[in-house]
Regions:
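Generic short amphipathic/hydrophobic targeting helices enriched at N-termini
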Residues: 1-2, 15, 48
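N-terminal secretory signal peptides that target proteins for export/translocation
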Residues: 1-10
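Glycine-centered signal
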Residues: 3, 30-31
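Intrinsically disordered/low-complexity terminal segments and short unstructured peptides
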Residues: 4, 25-26, 58
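Intrinsically disordered, low-complexity segments
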Residues: 10-12, 30
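Bacterial N-terminal signal peptides
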Residues: 14-27
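Flexible loop/hinge segments at secondary-structure junctions
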Residues: 32-335
Length: 335
């Protein structure tokens, strides 16, 4: 599983300059787990149809930027005259873009908040449609030289949050408070995270902090790659980002739900069975009126994403593919 990772990636680009953007990246991520990531053998190949033309705009999640780029490239091999423009400033930018008609696709690394759904429904009198497109294990990264072998969710919460809603008995500021006894244990913990526009920020706040408050010491980064890059350059650093951003200079820390429970790797199997605490779906939101099919170009783009070729690109980008039975259910939403 290889992909080029784009550091300091601009928020908006068109496919006409993708090759140049890919050349800008320098890190080559490794496999996200010891096991090989498996495609469901029941996935179907994409079948090209006639009449597909025009353009698609996508505004939303930074986490999905690279994957959308790969999907767009693959789709344009089928339909060379199609243009796809992608802007990734964070999941919170997707709902207003859909409401205002600025984009046909709203990629998000979390589900929409009730307030976002309500705003959409006030304008259109129906709800937005959520399309799961991949599985991500939101990973906790440390520097490759950090010897920590695992963290409980309570410890993770006590590192990142001043609220400590998982019930840990003390604020964790030093690595020795996680069980490290060597010289490394006396090091203060440097904390890296995303900004509040990010869906990853919101997902981590909800699931890792139980909606507690982040510590003021968290160094907010503009993108997923920036978090991992910062941790790779800081021996005492810790941060969270999508599993597709793993590089050779960081490690992913296994997590346990509680003290004494087994640590779970951020693997495909543990994400599929729900035992990894921070697994999530990644979504595309679309504006689909009831009893009315999506525009042909949008419908076919989603069908390509759901094809064997599209889910193979999910694996290429470091995320986990969907099962064929889920895809069959979701495809029925498109008509």
């Amino acid at each position: 599983m290889k992909r080029l990772m784009m550091k300091n990636m601009p928020a908006s680009w068109s496919l006409w300059c993708l090759v140049l953007l890919w050349a800008f990246g320098t890190n080559i991520p490794l496999a996200s787990a010891d096991e090989a990531i498996q495609l469901d053998p029941a996935l179907k190949s994409y079948s090209k149809v006639s009449g597909v033309s025009g353009s698609i705009g996508s505004i939303g999640s930074d986490t999905l930027n690279n994957l959308l780029t790969l999907w767009a490239e693959g789709f344009r091999k089928q339909y060379p005259n199609v243009k796809i423009e992608i802007e990734g400033k964070g999941s919170s930018t997707a709902p207003p873009a859909l409401i205002e008609g600025m984009a046909l696709l709203g990629p998000m690394s979390r589900t929409m908040k009730n307030s976002e759904i309500d705003a959409f429904e006030r304008k259109f009198r129906y709800k937005p449609t959520a399309i799961p497109v991949a599985i991500d294990a939101l990973a906790v990264y440390v520097n490759k030289d950090n010897p920590v072998q695992g963290l409980t969710m309570a410890q993770l919460d006590a590192i990142f949050s001043k609220s400590r809603r998982w019930g840990h008995n003390e604020n964790i500021q030093l690595w020795k408070q996680t069980g490290l006894n060597d010289d490394f244990g006396n090091s203060p913990i440097s904390i890296y995270g995303r900004n509040s526009a990010s869906g990853t920020y919101g997902f981590f706040k909800e699931h890792a902090l139980k909606n507690g408050d982040y510590k003021d010491e968290v160094k907010e980064q503009p993108g997923s790659a920036s978090v991992v890059q910062s941790v790779s350059e800081d021996q005492t650093g810790i941060g969270y980002s999508g599993i597709g951003y793993l590089t050779s200079n960081v490690r992913i820390v296994p997590l346990a739900e509680k003290e004494g429970a087994p640590f779970k790797e951020a693997s495909q199997q543990n994400s599929d069975n729900g035992s990894y605490p921070l697994w999530r779906h990644l979504y595309l939101y679309v504006n689909k009126a009831p009893n009315k099919p999506l525009d042909l170009i949008v419908r076919e783009f989603i069908k390509f994403i759901y094809s064997k070729e599209g889910q193979r690109l999910v694996v290429k980008d470091g995320f986990f593919p969907l099962k064929a039975d889920l895809i069959e259910r979701e495809l029925r939403k498109l008509d």
